Amino acid sequence: MTRLQQRLEEALANLPDALRTSLTPIINAEFKGVISKEQFQSLQADSELSDKELRLALLPLAAAFSVAPISNFYVGAIARGLTGNLYFGANMEYNDVQLGQTIHAEQSAISHAWIQGETGISDITINFSPCGHCRQFMNELTTADSLMVQLPERNEKSLQEYLPESFGPKDLGIEGGLLAPLSHNLALETDSPLLRKALEAANRSHAPYSHNLSGIALEMESGEVYYGMYAENAAFNPSLPPLQVALVHANMSREDILTVKSAALVEDHKGAISHLAITQSTLEALNPDVTLEYASL
């Protein structure tokens, strides 16, 4: 049994009997942190829990995906997409990498939903109050004005109540927002499957400020490939690089992120910044033998 599955089963064991019985077939060795709208409705009926109570009860399962070798502080988040599906996320840290590369649980859950094709988030449930960094990150979303935030033992509140007089994309003349469906039509002639997958990700990236349209693909020792696209933020610092989104993709797919063996990064040369140097250094900290292909379009 993997460490992740052990954590999931430990979390399951602490749930009310009716909920545990209904969840057990779902939380199997193939579970990748997604609960469909239909599954959620079935769990709610079986457990007789309210929508809020059920989401809060599921948080320990989301936190089981946490990778926190520095803080040993496990945070879970559950983002509900506009489809009604729920996406787990958890904080991620890396030894020997500067703390700015850390992924917060809210960023993880939202990235997970983005990877799965969601175009907006209706609500997010978190086991600890969102930090200012995450409040600003969420304010980039297409649904920032209507997004609701649920914490344990508190009433649900809007993001705008957590971030009064907020600064966001509209203040910089940007319409749309993070998770808006995009296709930038970047093109690259290559025989590399990894570069092609990174290009697909770059074409979905959100980079209205630096115009650094960028995406990455990671190949793991298992042979599986995971991708990520750049999620830029109006406040700049809360931006989430493509590598971090790809690492969320891998982690929520039950991969050990230390087993990345090769990567490919694609960027638009017209961008005002580059992810190349920080991507190289972070990958090398995960695996000193990793190889990185790079294309500047």
From Swiss-Prot:
Substrate binds at N91, M92, E93. The keyword Glycosyltransferase does not apply. GO terms for molecular function: cytidine deaminase activity; identical protein binding; zinc ion binding. It catalyses: cytidine + H2O + H(+) = uridine + NH4(+); 2'-deoxycytidine + H2O + H(+) = 2'-deoxyuridine + NH4(+). The active site is at E106. Its EC number is 3.5.4.5. Residues 50-170, 189-297 form the CMP/dCMP-type deaminase domain. It comes from the Bacteria. The keyword Zinc applies. One of its GO terms (biological process) is cytidine deamination. InterPro entries: APOBEC/CMP_deaminase_Zn-bd, CMP_dCMP_dom, Cyd/dCyd_deaminase_Zn-bd, Cyt/Deoxycyt_deaminase, Cyt_deam_dimer, Cytidine_deaminase-like, Cytidine_deaminase_bacteria. Its cofactor is Zn(2+). PANTHER family: CYTIDINE DEAMINASE. Homodimer. Belongs to the cytidine and deoxycytidylate deaminase family. This enzyme scavenges exogenous and endogenous cytidine and 2'-deoxycytidine for UMP synthesis. This is Cytidine deaminase.
